[in-house]
């Protein structure tokens, strides 16, 4: 990475994979108890990575961040790391809670959306077609677990309410016999999940 230009770094920028890697490392640190040496090494190496990704990355790549947060993997990673009291860093915790609150803020409500079936879906700019975003919902769930873990029960209730609303929105993507009549092979598509509300593409993930 040190030999790459800033343009090359930007082209390789991803919200997903660093958080996913840190979640994997957290699982190793917390659960692979048969290898104490590895656990110590993982903790030592992960702390500066978390510090950089939470506090420094936004300074270098602020223009790549969108209004609707995209870092659900990192939210899950921080929730898992919080099982270790030494990793209950205020900056990490605030990152999760602030991103979750921003997701909720950019979620259509029944009495505040262009169409009633947008309820529970997310948007970048108000008026967008809604995004029934399961990946971001994983970040919301992580925020709920983290709030419970830290005994912030009012906050946990707020996040759980948002999770339930988002889950109802996700159900609209479920393909059953009532909605697959136009498919070439309805028997094959039944019980699948659509990629988007307005597309009949099936998600294989």
For the regions a protein language model found, what residue spans apply to each?
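Active-site lining segments of carbohydrate-active enzymes
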Residues: 2-34, 58
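Glycine- and acidic/polar-rich repeat regions and solenoidal domains
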Residues: 59-60, 76, 80-92, 96, ...
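CBM-like carbohydrate-recognition segments
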Residues: 105-205
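Residues at structural and domain junctions
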Residues: 7-11, 39, 60-64, 122, ...
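Well-ordered alpha-helical scaffold segments within catalytic/enzyme domains
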Residues: 20-37, 73-88, 135-155
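Extended, well-ordered alpha-helical scaffold segments
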Residues: 1, 33-56, 87-107, 149-177
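Aromatic- and histidine-enriched alpha-helix N-cap/loop-to-helix transition segments
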Residues: 12-23, 65-76, 127-138, 203-205
């Amino acid at each position: 990475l040190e030999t790459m230009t800033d343009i090359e770094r930007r082209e390789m920028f991803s919200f997903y994979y660093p958080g996913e890697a840190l979640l994997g490392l957290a699982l190793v640190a917390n659960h692979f108890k048969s290898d104490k040496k590895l656990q110590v090494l993982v903790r030592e190496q992960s702390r500066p990575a978390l510090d950089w990704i939470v506090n420094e990355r936004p300074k270098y790549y602020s223009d790549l961040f969108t209004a609707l947060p995209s870092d659900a993997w990192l939210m899950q990673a921080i929730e898992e790391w919080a099982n270790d009291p030494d990793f209950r860093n205020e900056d990490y915790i605030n990152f999760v809670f602030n991103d979750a609150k921003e997701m909720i803020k950019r979620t259509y409500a029944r009495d505040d959306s262009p169409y009633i079936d947008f309820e529970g879906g997310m948007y970048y700019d108000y008026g967008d077609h809604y995004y029934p975003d399961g990946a971001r919902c994983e970040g919301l769930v992580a925020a709920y677990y983290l709030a419970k873990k830290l005994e912030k029960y009012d906050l946990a209730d707020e996040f759980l309410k948002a999770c339930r609303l988002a889950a109802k929105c996700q159900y609209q993507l479920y393909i059953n016999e009532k909605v697959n009549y136009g498919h070439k092979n309805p028997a094959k598509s039944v019980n699948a999940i659509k990629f988007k509300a307005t597309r009949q593409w099936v998600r294989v993930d």
